[in-house]
From Swiss-Prot:
Descriptive protein name: Mediator of RNA polymerase II transcription subunit 9
SS bonds (residue pairs): none
Family classification: Belongs to the Mediator complex subunit 9 family.
One Pfam family named in its UniProt record: Med9
Subcellular location: Nucleus
Function description: Component of the Mediator complex, a coactivator involved in the regulated transcription of nearly all RNA polymerase II-dependent genes. Mediator functions as a bridge to convey information from gene-specific regulatory proteins to the basal RNA polymerase II transcription machinery. Mediator is recruited to promoters by direct interactions with regulatory proteins and serves as a scaffold for the assembly of a functional preinitiation complex with RNA polymerase II and the general transcription factors.
Gene: MED9
GO terms classed as biological process: regulation of transcription by RNA polymerase II
Lineage summary: Eukaryota, Metazoa, Ecdysozoa, Arthropoda, Hexapoda
Coiled-coil annotated spans: 84-141
Keyword Nucleus tagged: yes
Gene Ontology cellular component list: mediator complex
Length: 143
């Protein structure tokens, strides 16, 4: 643990780079402690979600909206009530879309563009290969 220039504690973990060197500073792909501190202090109130934790259930509401639009009542009073119900269901669908957008914004890595994600993936693959090689090397060594 080290102190940053603004006197916040930063946890700098050693990282094995693709060329086999150990890097102690945070990479541009990992959040710094100050970003995590902002989140824990309530400045950024988002928490990290996984794809499995997403609660995006929009198909039943879309089905209800389509059913509502397909109805064609003959009486004006019934038409008005059906129209209000349809507007309510559309508003509910809009709320679900907004909720889905908020949840997707909380996914880790969503703020990286495609090139950054591919670069990060390649780096992780190289780290994985290096770790596999180290494991094989130490398995073969006798103590």
């Amino acid at each position: 643990m080290e102190l940053s220039p603004n006197n916040q504690i930063e946890d700098r973990k050693p990282i094995l780079t693709a060329d086999g060197l150990v890097q102690t500073s945070n990479s541009p792909f990992e959040p710094t402690i100050s970003q995590e501190t902002q989140t824990s202090n309530g400045i950024g109130t988002q928490c990290q979600l996984t794809v499995d934790q997403l609660d995006i259930e929009i198909l039943p509401i879309i089905y209800d909206v389509v059913r509502c639009v397909e109805k064609d009542p003959l009486e004006n009073a019934v038409k008005l009530r059906e129209s209000q119900d349809c507007n309510h269901k559309i508003f509910e669908l809009q709320k679900r879309f907004e909720s889905a957008r908020e949840q997707i914004r909380q996914l880790p890595g969503i703020d990286y563009n495609k090139d950054e994600q591919l670069q990060r993936l390649e780096l992780l693959r190289n780290q994985f290969k290096l770790k596999q090689q180290l494991i094989r090397k130490y398995k073969d060594t006798e103590f």
